[in-house]
């Protein structure tokens, strides 16, 4: 049964007090995770906050957004973990209903955190607020001058900024933003501050906002410099400047003026577009599938193999192909899907290849629809000599060449590479380098882990906690999502939802960076008088064939197209250069020149 649209969206902000210290030589590095109980009684992850270093009283700036449904009892579980580089230690958890938060004065609850043995592990305060979505983003810069000197040595100050907004019902403030530290300056510049208008002020232009400035210290408590209060409407006024006031100094010194000044520059509100607007405007989504052909999967003829074709149901590879493919393919203008293998030896070859066509035909990498991908996989996996090792970089570089073709305002495309694998990668450095270099392209990478292997390194590739770096260069955007199939066995809909959860955010980050706007929705096709009706869910089977190739588009089959290089015009298929009237496509593995994406 489909869920009703949410009554509204609610933002949860979390802070903790005196949590257990799990670290021996320092303090815990806490992170909060929030889960909601689904209709099957299982807790489903809604979101995570950032990790705060060395803090037993963390106030998380990352909000957790949840759909509020009036007609349901929504049970929430809050977990706090101490997050180290390669491990997470459970600190404590607490549960309550969303209604219990919303019905409290100030929409605020205080919960006791408990360990797994039921012992006290600290406390947690949760504040809820309804989100009024205006689809607007506010941007501004802050320029500080003559801040108070706080350090005896050096330049005298290492300032950073905290922005908080007022909660009217409780007359308190919640932290929404924290800047990087500006090292060694009394004249800090906080540039490129950007957030949704709802996040800054809840959509209320008169909502009070607090700007606090602190001097960062390596050891001990950070020193308070001062603060000023304003609202979004004032921020947008030209030539705004504020005194940074330290109330303690103001009370003690009769001639006190300020602890510095801050002026506002380039404050603007920009319209924010949503994912659906781009899709409705004709943006082409493309899927590329990569299949692990390493020996660790087991001989495909062995019933214990991950590649075994089981008459009783789909194996995990086929399950991933169907779950994700059936969601993405409806957004494509053609059903053609490139499919590649890696870590195997093709028939007639002696060398391992880390990016080869699963069709086993170098001039034809395309399959028609999800069924065509399945047919190709089942027909050819037994013909490939499973080998190894597991390398991702060649496959990612191929997808990057594919994604780099023909992007423009009028011809928008976005590529999703789905890699299905059973084990750890052995070219981590090269893979990270390929991901970093691809992070500026219209590309997302989904990694689905099958089987019971240790997938620790995969979580490193998923840059949720920290941006990937290679050779001193940071990734422009997070483009990787990893999901372990074993967590979603027999739940294909939930698998697809989790695998694709980050795609809209990754998609929008690219479009926003390069200032691509949604195109107007194309007009509906003309109605031809006397023509038979066209259904999106036909109940009878008809045979549709391509006029040039004779392909039965209702059957899962490989597309018999020749590959030739075309330079004249980009194609609606997202870089494959497909001309269905001529039956030719670009060979995306050879000689493709990159397109420079310039910010307009």
Swiss-Prot record:
The keyword Metal-binding applies. Residues 535-583 are annotated as: Disordered. One of its GO terms (cellular component) is late endosome membrane. Residues 1-111, 116-246 form the C2 domain. Coiled coil: none annotated. SMART domains: C2, VWA. It holds the Pfam family C2. GO terms for biological process: cellular response to calcium ion; contractile vacuole discharge; contractile vacuole organization; culmination involved in sorocarp development; hypotonic response; mitotic cytokinesis; negative regulation of exocytosis; positive phototaxis. Ca(2+) 1 binds at residues 23, 29, 82, 84. Required for cytokinesis, contractile vacuole function and development. Belongs to the copine family. This is Copine-A.
């Amino acid at each position: 049964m489909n869920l009703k649209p949410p009554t509204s969206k609610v933002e949860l902000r979390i802070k903790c007090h005196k949590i257990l210290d799990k670290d021996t030589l320092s303090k815990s590095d806490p992170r909060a995770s929030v889960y909601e109980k689904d209709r099957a009684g299982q807790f489903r992850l809604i979101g995570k906050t950032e990790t705060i270093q060395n803090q037993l009283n963390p106030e998380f700036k990352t909000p957790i957004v949840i759909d509020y449904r009036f007609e349901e009892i929504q049970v929430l579980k809050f977990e706090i973990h101490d997050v180290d580089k390669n491990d997470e230690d459970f600190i404590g958890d607490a549960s309550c209903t969303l209604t219990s938060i919303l019905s409290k004065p100030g929409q605020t609850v205080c919960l006791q955190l408990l360990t797994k043995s039921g012992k006290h592990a600290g406390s947690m305060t949760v504040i809820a607020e309804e989100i009024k979505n205006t689809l607007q983003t506010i941007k501004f810069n802050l320029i500080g001058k003559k801040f108070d000197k706080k350090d005896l040595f050096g330049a005298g100050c290492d300032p950073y900024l905290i922005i908080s907004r007022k909660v009217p019902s409780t007359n308190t403030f919640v932290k929404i933003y924290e800047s990087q530290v500006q090292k060694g300056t009394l004249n800090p510049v906080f540039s490129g501050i950007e957030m949704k208008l709802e996040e800054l002020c809840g959509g209320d232009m008169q909502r009070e906002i607090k700007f606090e400035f602190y001097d960062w210290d390596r050891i001990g408590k950070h020193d308070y410099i001062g603060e000023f209060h304003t609202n979004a409407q004032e921020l947008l006024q030209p030539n705004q400047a504020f005194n940074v006031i330290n109330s303690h100094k103001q009370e003690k010194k009769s001639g006190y003026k300020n602890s510095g000044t801050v002026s506002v520059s380039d404050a603007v509100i920009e319209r924010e577009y949503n994912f659906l607007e781009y899709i409705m405007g004709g943006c082409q989504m493309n899927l590329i599938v990569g299949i692990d052909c390493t020996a660790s999967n087991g001989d495909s003829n062995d019933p214990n193999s991950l590649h075994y074709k089981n008459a009783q149901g789909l194996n995990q590879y086929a399950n991933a192909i169907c779950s994700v493919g059936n969601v993405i393919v409806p957004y494509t203008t053609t059903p053609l899907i490139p499919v590649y293998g890696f870590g195997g030896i093709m028939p007639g070859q002696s060398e391992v290849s880390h990016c080869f066509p699963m069709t086993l035909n170098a001039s034809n990498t395309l399959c028609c629809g999800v069924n065509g991908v399945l047919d190709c996989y089942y027909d050819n996996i037994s013909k490939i000599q499973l080998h190894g090792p597991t390398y991702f970089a060649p496959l990612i570089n191929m997808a990057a060449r594919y994604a780099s073709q023909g992007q423009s305002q009028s011809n928008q495309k976005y590529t999703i590479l789905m890699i299905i694998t059973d084990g750890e990668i052995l070219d981590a450095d090269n893979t990270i380098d390929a991901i970093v270099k691809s992070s500026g392209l219209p590309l997302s990478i989904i990694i689905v882990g099958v089987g019971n292997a240790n997938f620790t390194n995969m979580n490193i590739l998923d840059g949720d906690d920290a941006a990937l770096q290679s050779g001193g260069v940071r990734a422009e955007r997070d483009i990787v999502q990893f999901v372990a199939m074993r967590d979603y066995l027999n739940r294909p809909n939930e698998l697809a939802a989790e695998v694709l959860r980050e795609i809209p955010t990754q998609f929008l980050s690219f479009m926003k960076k390069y200032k691509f706007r949604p195109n107007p929705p194309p007009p509906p096709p003309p109605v031809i008088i006397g023509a038979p009706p066209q259904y999106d869910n036909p109940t009878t089977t008809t045979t549709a064939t391509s006029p040039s190739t004779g392909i039965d588009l209702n059957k899962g089959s490989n597309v018999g197209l020749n590959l030739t290089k075309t330079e004249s015009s980009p194609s609606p298929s997202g870089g494959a250069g497909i001309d269905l009237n001529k039956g030719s496509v670009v060979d995306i593995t050879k000689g493709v020149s990159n397109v420079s994406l310039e910010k307009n």
